Amino acid sequence: MKLRRSMLFVPGSNAAMLSNSFIYKPDSIMFDLEDAVALKEKDSARLLVAHALQHPLYKEIETVVRVNPLDSEFGLLDLNSVVRAGVDVVRMPKTESAQDVLDMDHAITEIEKACGREAGSTKMLAAIESPLGITQANQIAFASKRLIGIALGAEDYVRNLKTERSPEGIELLFARCSILQAARAAGIQAFDTVYSNANNEEGFLKEAALIKQLGFDGKSLINPRQIELLHNLFAPTQKDVEQAKRIIEAAVEAERQGAGVVSLNGKMIDAPIIDRAKLVLERAKSGIREE
């Protein structure tokens, strides 16, 4: 499964950022045609994003576009433009049901047919931003083979709860756990919401550590400075890597000997621990954490 620790939001109407945001090296670039774009700039932003998607340097990084809802006047126009331009992943906003996913899947299928793009090559990411969506997270996660993951959109969700975001994020715990459980059950990835105070590095790291501990695959970002911080947090330490190698070596040796039980230093090593060691080694390919 592709490494997607960081998804950097880039406003679709910001020509300067569109021209060079690949230099920050997030795992995915997410061009935004929805909330970050004023109504009067929707059409020009769509053209800018379509042009950026065809830039050779954006072929070397995964591209995601958050389109406007299909039931808006801009949604289908956005979708037609970005699918034809070769976007890797379409981010659905405000997903509240499996039917929302199916409708988007069908629309993408028709566009792929019309432009000659390989069927199924356009992937989807469903953003859940309401209490209704959270209650339907499991159905949403299983709704389409195009889905690479589901993501939490906190601002609308918290407003609908009739509360506000706190430094501790306690108001998001149920939503985060619901999204994570649904994603894991469906075998797809789970992504956390943005941390909106770009100047609060300590607060960002605290929240990022929390979602990593919960089990999230990555996080949406609004500031390039957050990318390195997040990648370093998700990276294993050298000590982690060395222990993971010992676990894998013990498992390989046990299999070679036909032993039914894997042990290391007198302790039994079961399948979940071996799987965790494999994940550590996979993450280590992208860097070792600075301690």
UniProtKB/Swiss-Prot annotation:
A single GO molecular function term of this UniProt record: citryl-CoA lyase activity
Location(s), subcellular: Cytoplasm
Principal location class: cytoplasm
Binding-site residues, Mg(2+): E129, D156
UniProt-annotated binding residues for substrate: R66, E129
UniProt-listed Enzyme Commission number(s): 4.1.3.6, 4.1.3.34
Residues in coiled coil: none
Cofactor binding comment, as recorded: Binds 1 Mg(2+) ion per subunit.
Biological-process GO terms, alphabetical: acetyl-CoA metabolic process; oxaloacetate metabolic process
The reaction(s) this protein catalyses: citrate = oxaloacetate + acetate; (3S)-citryl-CoA = oxaloacetate + acetyl-CoA
Family: Belongs to the HpcH/HpaI aldolase family. Citrate lyase beta subunit subfamily.
Known function: Represents a citryl-ACP lyase.
Protein's name in the database: Citrate lyase subunit beta
Species in which this protein is naturally found: Haemophilus influenzae (strain ATCC 51907 / DSM 11121 / KW20 / Rd)
Record lineage: Bacteria, Pseudomonadati, Pseudomonadota, Gammaproteobacteria, Pasteurellales
Designated gene of the protein: citE
